[in-house]
Amino acid sequence: MAAKQLQFDEEARRSLERGVDTLADTVKVTLGPKGRYVVLDKKWGAPTITNDGVTVAKEVDLTDPYENLGAQLAKEVATKTNDVAGDGTTTATVLAQALVHEGLRAVASGANPVGLKRGIEKAVDAVVEELRSISRAIDTTSDMASVATISSRDETIGALIAEAFDKVGKDGVITVDESQTFGTELDFTEGMQFDKGYLSPYMVTDQDRMEAVIEDPYILIHSGKISSMNDLLPLLEKVIAAHGSLFIVAEDVDGEALSTLVVNKIRGTFSSVAVKAPAFGDRRKAMLQDIATLTGGQVVAPEVGLKLDQVGLEVLGRAKKVVVTKDNTTIVDGAGDKADVEGRVIQLRAEYDNSDSEWDREKLQERIAKLAGGVCVIRVGAATEVELNEKKHRIEDAVSATRAAIEEGIVAGGGSALIHAAHVLDGDLHLEGDEKAGVQIVAKAVREPLRWIAENGGEPGYVIVSKVAEMEPGHGYNGKTGQYVDLIADGVIDPLKVTRSALANAASIASLLLTTETLVVDKPEEDNEDK
């Protein structure tokens, strides 16, 4: 086991703070409509230019091992916020930095970190509850366009994303792809997505995006587990003879069968991707039938008289393309008969109407959306690969932000919602001592996102924060125009989910950092010089 080196007490916390500062200072220049870009060096190919907080954060690793621990904690804030809400990563990082600064100042003054942590948690709960109360549901396509425009910094992209959600609905699937032209356009295709990823990373075809993409595959839908290669081999030979590729949906694919698929993929002999079937029990059977209907195939199962080692190509479904990530599968343009798909949707709607269970109705609604909603592909074009990647980052963030807004509603944007929601902390939540100090830490920290939106636009941040704090909720500073306006009427809105996730995740990591007393890292190996 490698030797370790340690840091303790104040020295340890200051190292963590320096690491958080380094990462946050790198990320926060991107905040707001006038935020700047960060250029990321790549070992191969052109550099990446982006204003996406989590993309920048993932690239930061520091040489000092203690400071690097702080940077990695701050990175976790951005990553977690991106996973939950898909946007707001820069805001989350700025909030984490502010909470750490104010918290460590309080600890240095003699406050107990555990008491501060409790106060911070209670304050965040109160602010999130207030955010929920001042939020409103998204009502119109123009609201969706406003959210997407704020996130992408582009009105044309905002309108395109709003149109995409209009087509597929809130449960529909929207993906971002490359275009062969310079423009950005919308392509609506019927399709289905479910939350199961590839069974082996060796199946990946696009290493940059960690996706397995197969064109025009045969689709095997199997109700059981596939372990033996002897069962799969007869069908595999028929697919290879037809010069096709194979996509497998089954309860599981493991053992000899999985190994053979992977080896053939690595050798370039035969292209295949396997995923586990979505859901469990009766709902899994129903969803396999949905996939079969969409792709024009049949579910291979003993109860319907179909055995894997005896079936031919006629029971396999087809699709134009299947895209599989580590978490999700998207089937695009299934070859099933439209009348059969419509009949299946009508059947599901009847089940929905007759169901008394809220949970069953919710799951049926999801299945209807997956069958009827389809897939919208936003095709992105640009003059160079660098510009293309930057544009794709912005559009992917904007799609996530719009979906978050549809799910939980919107609040006034530009950092003002946090400031106005924090008025609930004016009485310190009737807490005392260190918990009261924790509340005051949150009250100060929530001002930082607006401050940096203003600073990045060349305006005095503290002055603007003070003015906005005195305005009524819903009003604030428009960083793009430099005016004080009714933000919602002006289309400056943020998804509630993004705002609350940013605050909650920042507070979670900052609280842990404040209560840290010891750092343990690997001792660097000393170079042995020849004497």
Curated annotation (Swiss-Prot):
Its main location: cytoplasm. The keyword Chloroplast does not apply. One of its GO terms (biological process) is protein refolding. PROSITE patterns: CHAPERONINS_CPN60 (PS00296). One of its GO terms (cellular component) is cytoplasm. GO terms for molecular function: ATP binding; ATP-dependent protein folding chaperone; isomerase activity; unfolded protein binding. It catalyses: ATP + H2O + a folded polypeptide = ADP + phosphate + an unfolded polypeptide. Keywords: ATP-binding, Chaperone, Cytoplasm, Isomerase, Nucleotide-binding. Its EC number is 5.6.1.7. Forms a cylinder of 14 subunits composed of two heptameric rings stacked back-to-back. Interacts with the co-chaperonin GroES. Together with its co-chaperonin GroES, plays an essential role in assisting protein folding. The GroEL-GroES system forms a nano-cage that allows encapsulation of the non-native substrate proteins and provides a physical environment optimized to promote and accelerate protein folding. Belongs to the chaperonin (HSP60) family. This is Chaperonin GroEL 2. It comes from Cutibacterium acnes (strain DSM 16379 / KPA171202). The gene is groEL2.
